Amino acid sequence: MEFAAENEGKSGGGLHSVAEGVRLSPEPGREGVRDLAGAEEFGGGEEGTGLTGIKEIGDGEEGSGQRPEEIPMDLTVVKQEIIDWPGTEGRLAGQWVEQEVEDRPEVKDENAGVLEVKQETDSSLVVKEAKVGEPEVKEEKVKEEVMDWSEVKEEKDNLEIKQEEKFVGQCIKEELMHGECVKEEKDFLKKEIVDDTKVKEEPPINHPVGCKRKLAMSRCETCGTEEAKYRCPRCMRYSCSLPCVKKHKAELTCNGVRDKTAYISIQQFTEMNLLSDYRFLEDVARTADHISRDAFLKRPISNKYMYFMKNRARRQGINLKLLPNGFTKRKENSTFFDKKKQQFCWHVKLQFPQSQAEYIEKRVPDDKTINEILKPYIDPEKSDPVIRQRLKAYIRSQTGVQILMKIEYMQQNLVRYYELDPYKSLLDNLRNKVIIEYPTLHVVLKGSNNDMKVLHQVKSESTKNVGNEN
């Protein structure tokens, strides 16, 4: 833009110098040289065009001896160019003043100088033709430079918009800026984001009872390789599978039952703990109410009742022995005699050595067979699914099971067992035997190598030895 303005100033200055240096000599038949003021008088006071003054000069030239045929042709050309000059000047002034006058006031002064040159010039056709031709060249240069300047502004705006989009989207693109190429940094940003999103693995921490923690954020505390899926309600250890659950129960001797009376500090006491305590009190009240309604457990057992139990057992051929109060078996025993049905309801303990399981059956009538007693445990169809899973060694066995009962009042080093008939009733199997508090039945697999020696096997071995000696 500055270069265009300098060229324009030079061209305007040249016109002014040419106009000042030209001094037209008087021609024959004319009174003298008329300057621009005289042209205004001949033109009737019109400013800007001077068309009337030129016409009067042409009339004066008719008497001067010039060719009358050439002058009208030149006047028509001059008229058209002079008529077009104000419009061209207005367009140039409008564009220049709107875009560049505020920043560069010198251009406005040069336009004013051109107007003065136009007014001070003589009526010479050659000078006027040179003046009128000059502004057309200036107009084209100004238009071209103005267009270039607007394109530069649009390119700058586009670059600013691209940079804003680049920062907003957090994506760096390859762009040519000052002849240098900016490399893409997408991969670098992605690596940083991935590093930030990684979760650091922390060693397992034993949280107190009642503490909540998401299972997805912990590992199995038994194997330490898989993701935790279960949590033991008692010891709060995390496990991933059934083998890990069994392993942790065997190692820690945990029964998997939540301890409802475990200590919880005030800081860790939550609404869930309050609800658990409330339900525990409800269970205690329900148990107390159940005992109060039970006719047989309503009163404490007196010595008279103990003698009554022994006498009834003796009548059925059972030698029943009762322990003093305070012994564990005495507390556990729930055996009673039903006077209406005239039968015993026994407290029976069932032990499964091959599965290391132990169960208790209460109020078992003495007329019930042993097979009926074992059906809820080892029957493939009628047994409980949880118990069946634990006793699957007995269910899958094709050899069957043996029911044994320990012989009481034997020497300490001699442990022998009775083999019971599973098809007979409990009363028939207990006759002529000694029972301490309640019967304990050992269910073992046939043919398994164990240290349990049955009584009839001992008798057969003794008879063989006697025969060999004879």
From Swiss-Prot:
<feature type="cross-link" description="Glycyl lysine isopeptide (Lys-Gly) (interchain with G-Cter in SUMO2)">
    <location>
        <position position="200"/>
    </location>
</feature>
<dbReference type="GO" id="GO:0051259">
    <property type="term" value="P:protein complex oligomerization"/>
</dbReference>
<feature type="compositionally biased region" description="Gly residues">
    <location>
        <begin position="41"/>
        <end position="51"/>
    </location>
</feature>
<feature type="cross-link" description="Glycyl lysine isopeptide (Lys-Gly) (interchain with G-Cter in SUMO2)">
    <location>
        <position position="173"/>
    </location>
</feature>
<feature type="cross-link" description="Glycyl lysine isopeptide (Lys-Gly) (interchain with G-Cter in SUMO2)">
    <location>
        <position position="118"/>
    </location>
</feature>
<feature type="cross-link" description="Glycyl lysine isopeptide (Lys-Gly) (interchain with G-Cter in SUMO2)">
    <location>
        <position position="143"/>
    </location>
</feature>
<keyword id="KW-0479">Metal-binding</keyword>
<comment type="subunit">
    <text>Interacts with FBL, SNU13, NOP58, NUFIP1, RUVBL1, RUVBL2 and TAF9. Interacts (via HIT-type zinc finger) with the RUVBL1/RUVBL2 complex in the presence of ADP.</text>
</comment>
<feature type="binding site">
    <location>
        <position position="235"/>
    </location>
    <ligand>
        <name>Zn(2+) 2</name>
    </ligand>
</feature>
<dbReference type="Pfam" id="PF04438">
    <property type="entry name" value="zf-HIT"/>
</dbReference>
<comment type="similarity">
    <text>Belongs to the BCD1 family.</text>
</comment>
<dbReference type="GO" id="GO:0042802">
    <property type="term" value="F:identical protein binding"/>
</dbReference>
<feature type="cross-link" description="Glycyl lysine isopeptide (Lys-Gly) (interchain with G-Cter in SUMO2)">
    <location>
        <position position="79"/>
    </location>
</feature>
<keyword id="KW-0862">Zinc</keyword>
<dbReference type="GO" id="GO:0000463">
    <property type="term" value="P:maturation of LSU-rRNA from tricistronic rRNA transcript (SSU-rRNA, 5.8S rRNA, LSU-rRNA)"/>
</dbReference>
<feature type="binding site">
    <location>
        <position position="232"/>
    </location>
    <ligand>
        <name>Zn(2+) 2</name>
    </ligand>
</feature>
<dbReference type="GO" id="GO:0048254">
    <property type="term" value="P:snoRNA localization"/>
</dbReference>
<feature type="binding site">
    <location>
        <position position="240"/>
    </location>
    <ligand>
        <name>Zn(2+) 1</name>
    </ligand>
</feature>
<dbReference type="InterPro" id="IPR051639">
    <property type="entry name" value="BCD1"/>
</dbReference>
<dbReference type="InterPro" id="IPR007529">
    <property type="entry name" value="Znf_HIT"/>
</dbReference>
<feature type="modified residue" description="Phosphoserine">
    <location>
        <position position="25"/>
    </location>
</feature>
<comment type="function">
    <text>Required for box C/D snoRNAs accumulation involved in snoRNA processing, snoRNA transport to the nucleolus and ribosome biogenesis.</text>
</comment>
<keyword id="KW-0690">Ribosome biogenesis</keyword>
<feature type="binding site">
    <location>
        <position position="220"/>
    </location>
    <ligand>
        <name>Zn(2+) 1</name>
    </ligand>
</feature>
<feature type="cross-link" description="Glycyl lysine isopeptide (Lys-Gly) (interchain with G-Cter in SUMO2)">
    <location>
        <position position="183"/>
    </location>
</feature>
<dbReference type="GO" id="GO:0000492">
    <property type="term" value="P:box C/D snoRNP assembly"/>
</dbReference>
<keyword id="KW-1017">Isopeptide bond</keyword>
<feature type="cross-link" description="Glycyl lysine isopeptide (Lys-Gly) (interchain with G-Cter in SUMO2)">
    <location>
        <position position="153"/>
    </location>
</feature>
<feature type="zinc finger region" description="HIT-type">
    <location>
        <begin position="220"/>
        <end position="254"/>
    </location>
</feature>
<dbReference type="GO" id="GO:0008270">
    <property type="term" value="F:zinc ion binding"/>
</dbReference>
<feature type="binding site">
    <location>
        <position position="248"/>
    </location>
    <ligand>
        <name>Zn(2+) 2</name>
    </ligand>
</feature>
<dbReference type="GO" id="GO:0051117">
    <property type="term" value="F:ATPase binding"/>
</dbReference>
<protein>
    <recommendedName>
        <fullName>Box C/D snoRNA protein 1</fullName>
    </recommendedName>
</protein>
<keyword id="KW-0863">Zinc-finger</keyword>
<feature type="cross-link" description="Glycyl lysine isopeptide (Lys-Gly) (interchain with G-Cter in SUMO2)">
    <location>
        <position position="459"/>
    </location>
</feature>
<feature type="cross-link" description="Glycyl lysine isopeptide (Lys-Gly) (interchain with G-Cter in SUMO2)">
    <location>
        <position position="162"/>
    </location>
</feature>
<dbReference type="GO" id="GO:0001094">
    <property type="term" value="F:TFIID-class transcription factor complex binding"/>
</dbReference>
<dbReference type="GO" id="GO:0070062">
    <property type="term" value="C:extracellular exosome"/>
</dbReference>
<feature type="cross-link" description="Glycyl lysine isopeptide (Lys-Gly) (interchain with G-Cter in SUMO2)">
    <location>
        <position position="108"/>
    </location>
</feature>
<keyword id="KW-0832">Ubl conjugation</keyword>
<dbReference type="GO" id="GO:0005634">
    <property type="term" value="C:nucleus"/>
</dbReference>
<dbReference type="GO" id="GO:0070761">
    <property type="term" value="C:pre-snoRNP complex"/>
</dbReference>
